[in-house]
């Protein structure tokens, strides 16, 4: 044995040829700080090993290396000096691999991402098996490769290909990597180690010039000035169009490659180190790393629920066809759970099947679904007018009109049809699950299952626990949501649950400005272009449906009569009364139509200004617009955490990211609060407290700020 550590071992695989194998104790290999130390120690041992002729780098697991240990990042990045030292030292460990006095071959199976890909790039040769996926996804964390990726990849596959890989963060299958020269061969999994060893032997025997293969990675980039300039200019345009100003990582990746292009290895690595460090101190990086960690926490919690499930969902029933019902039935059938779609009208059933067919047709056009699979999925949806058709299903998702009396009646009726062990759920967006359960004989078998529209695209499903909902029911429904490919987040019952409860104070803040005569178009521009929402509040209201939003204000007022009191003179109420329902009937805040080419159009309507009494072009300072929209949202999500509606700040952040499209570079409402600083937020909110209760922070937040605590410390949020 040449070296034995906790995560790495090195030994001769046969005389003269050593295998450096990653074998972490966990389920995957990753470069945490301890593993990087071991990597350096192992390479030092190899450097000093006599009679060494070649080295292959492998993994004992079904995947190679998934990258750095992201759980260490936020703590590490909070110390600037430590961060600078860490990235400089860590990147030089990969130089040790590249500088070994013998040929090196990386053997990749499964995922080789981030640092895993960078370890491969430090090898002279790379062999992948057919399961391999290789990539540098750091931009998705607001970062760039930090272990030499921006220096080595352009020298291996060319600057144009490297820029595409690095600035998009895309994963690449083995054969695609082979086409651009990122790997030298692709073999079947059972032949991987043998192929890597044979290549090392061939290089050691002089049949391959491994020194010539290594040399370009040590020198300035081999591209003439004109070629390089054209590549960089093209990349700058693409990055500006795709990443925009809110995501600095792709811009920094380009900067690192440009600054290092004419440098030898050390100079190019220094350029990368500097760019990497700069990004670690940005709000976007803190937010995007926070999202990753929150997503992992949410997934881990969901898996625990699902693991505890005693009932497996094999068949589903959907009550109410239409757009939502059709979408739910489609998603269930797509993921292998046959669905019975029941409605009282044939027209609605036809619409539901049409919705499923429309989604599948787009999949066929894009090459994601073949005709055979399309037919199979559609045949897994059974449209019916008969209640008895759902009597044997394992779960029913009610998706009828958002009316408590109608829902209550439908749920009670279907409960009498399904088996005693079947689970009943409601796809309500605001109505109390506890109240709906009062009509049921088995309330413990009932919960909310709130999908978001369009169902096939939106990842979030809120699982709402009523007062009498059993743990077994929640566990089974979470497992079903996971089977559907969704991200379930369990919340406790209250009007609006989590997402809509938090949304309506935000819309109320917006409406307050419109009531003062401020141009809604200007507000939308600020919230989209500067804050980063995919849609401003006026446009969002039109997409949700003005009538739907207006109806929800009635429900929210019933639950929170002072804080969310409905105002008949508000913009939403006025538009609803004028039957301007938004996109669904072509007119809301905006008017909707199509241009000569059939593309959808959205324009401000003079009639809207007249109806609402607001003035075209009247603006507020952008900071005030953001404050008046966002303070109510943050205050409400804090209340939800303090009242135990949602279990953690991480879950709340992910719910708003996945359910509302909260700007990822801001990380969610709690990460946004953390970035602003709680003291600063309180000071800002107090400035607007005279506008109403939605602007007034909780006593709990004041206590948290005084104690210097964070809502990400879950023990402090209860």
UniProtKB/Swiss-Prot annotation:
Its EC number is 4.2.1.17, 5.1.2.3, 5.3.3.8, 1.1.1.35. Heterotetramer of two alpha chains (FadB) and two beta chains (FadA). The lineage of its organism: Bacteria, Pseudomonadati, Pseudomonadota, Gammaproteobacteria, Alteromonadales. The keyword NAD applies. It catalyses: a (3S)-3-hydroxyacyl-CoA + NAD(+) = a 3-oxoacyl-CoA + NADH + H(+); a (3S)-3-hydroxyacyl-CoA = a (2E)-enoyl-CoA + H2O; a 4-saturated-(3S)-3-hydroxyacyl-CoA = a (3E)-enoyl-CoA + H2O; (3S)-3-hydroxybutanoyl-CoA = (3R)-3-hydroxybutanoyl-CoA. GO terms for biological process: fatty acid beta-oxidation. Involved in the aerobic and anaerobic degradation of long-chain fatty acids via beta-oxidation cycle. Catalyzes the formation of 3-oxoacyl-CoA from enoyl-CoA via L-3-hydroxyacyl-CoA. It can also use D-3-hydroxyacyl-CoA and cis-3-enoyl-CoA as substrate. The keyword Plastid does not apply. NAD(+) binds at residues 324, 343, 400-402, 407, 429, 453. In the N-terminal section; belongs to the enoyl-CoA hydratase/isomerase family. In the C-terminal section; belongs to the 3-hydroxyacyl-CoA dehydrogenase family. This is Fatty acid oxidation complex subunit alpha. Residues 1-188 are annotated as: Enoyl-CoA hydratase/isomerase. The active site is at 450 (for 3-hydroxyacyl-coa dehydrogenase activity). The record marks 118, 138 as: Important for catalytic activity. Substrate binds at residues 295, 500, 658.
């Amino acid at each position: 044995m040449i070296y034995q550590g906790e995560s790495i071992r090195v030994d001769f695989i046969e005389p003269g040829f050593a295998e450096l194998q990653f074998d972490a104790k966990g389920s995957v290999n990753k470069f945490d700080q301890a593993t990087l130390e071991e990597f350096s120690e192992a390479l030092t041992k190899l450097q000093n090993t006599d009679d060494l002729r070649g080295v292959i780098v492998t993994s004992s697991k079904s995947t190679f290396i998934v990258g750095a240990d992201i759980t260490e990042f936020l703590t590490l990045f909070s110390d600037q000096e430590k961060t600078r030292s860490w990235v400089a030292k860590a990147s030089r460990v990969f130089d040790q691999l590249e500088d070994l006095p013998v040929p090196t071959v990386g053997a990749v199976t499964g995922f080789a991402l981030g640092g895993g890909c960078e370890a491969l790039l430090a090898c002279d040769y790379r062999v992948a098996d057919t399961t391999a996926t290789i990539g540098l996804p750091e931009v998705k964390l607001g970062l760039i490769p930090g272990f030499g990726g921006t220096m080595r990849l352009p020298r291996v596959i060319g600057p144009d290909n490297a820029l595409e890989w690095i600035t998009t963060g895309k994963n690449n299958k083995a054969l695609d990597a082979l086409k651009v020269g990122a790997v030298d061969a692709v073999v079947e999994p059972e032949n991987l180690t043998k192929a890597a060893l044979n290549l090392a032997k061939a290089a050691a025997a002089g049949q391959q010039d491994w020194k010539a293969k290594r040399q370009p990675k040590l020198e300035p980039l081999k591209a003439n000035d004109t070629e390089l300039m054209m590549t960089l200019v093209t990349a700058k345009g693409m990055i500006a169009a795709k990443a925009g100003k809110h995501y600095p990582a792709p811009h920094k990746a380009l900067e690192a490659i440009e600054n290092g292009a004419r440098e030898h290895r050390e100079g190019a690595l220094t350029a990368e180190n500097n760019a990497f460090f700069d990004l670690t101190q940005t709000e976007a990086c803190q937010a995007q790393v926070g999202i990753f960690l929150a997503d992992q926490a949410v997934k881990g919690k969901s898996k625990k629920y699902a693991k505890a499930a005693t009932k497996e969902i094999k068949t589903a029933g959907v009550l109410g066809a239409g757009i939502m019902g059709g979408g739910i039935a489609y998603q269930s059938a797509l993921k292998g759970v046959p669905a019975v779609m029941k409605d009282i009208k044939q027209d609605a059933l036809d619409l539901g099947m049409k919705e499923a067919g429309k989604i599948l047709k787009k999949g066929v056009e894009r090459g994601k679904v073949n005709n055979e699979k399309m037919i199979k999925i559609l045949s897994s949806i059974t449209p019916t007018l008969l209640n008895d058709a759902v009597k044997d299903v394992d779960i029913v998702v009610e998706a009828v009109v958002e009316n408590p009396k109608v829902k209550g009646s439908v749920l009670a009726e279907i409960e009498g049809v399904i088996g005693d062990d079947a689970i009943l759920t409601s796809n309500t967006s605001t109505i109390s699950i506890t109240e709906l359960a009062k009509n049921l004989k088995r309330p413990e078998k009932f919960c909310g299952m709130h999908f978001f529209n369009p169902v096939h695209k939106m990842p979030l499903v809120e699982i709402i626990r009523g007062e009498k909902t059993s743990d077994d029911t929640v566990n089974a429904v979470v497992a079903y949501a996971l089977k559907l490919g969704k991200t379930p987040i369990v919340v406790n019952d209250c009007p609006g649950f989590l997402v809509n409860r938090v949304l309506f104070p935000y819309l109320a803040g917006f409406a307050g400005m419109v009531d003062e005569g401020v141009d809604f178009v200007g507000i939308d521009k600020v919230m989209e272009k500067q804050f980063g929402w995919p849609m401003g509040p006026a446009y969002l209201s039109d997409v949700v449906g003005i009538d739907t939003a207006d109806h929800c204000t009635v429900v929210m007022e019933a639950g929170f009569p002072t804080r969310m009191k409905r105002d008949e003179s508000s913009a939403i109420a006025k538009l609803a009364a004028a039957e301007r329902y938004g996109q669904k009937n072509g007119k809301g805040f905006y008017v909707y139509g199509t241009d000569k080419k059939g593309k959808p159009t959205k324009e401000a309507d003079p009639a809207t200004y007249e109806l609402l009494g607001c003035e075209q072009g009247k603006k507020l300072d952008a900071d005030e617009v953001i404050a008046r929209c966002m303070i109510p949202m943050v205050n409400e999500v804090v209340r939800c955490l303090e009242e135990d509606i949602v279990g953690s700040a991480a879950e709340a952040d992910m719910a708003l990211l996945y359910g509302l499209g909260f700007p990822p570079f801001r990380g969610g409402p709690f990460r946004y609060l953390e970035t602003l600083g709680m003291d600063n937020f309180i000071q800002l909110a107090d400035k607007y407290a005279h506008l109403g209760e939605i602007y007034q922070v909780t006593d709990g937040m004041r206590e948290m700020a005084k104690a210097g605590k964070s809502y990400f410390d879950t023990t402090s949020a209860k």
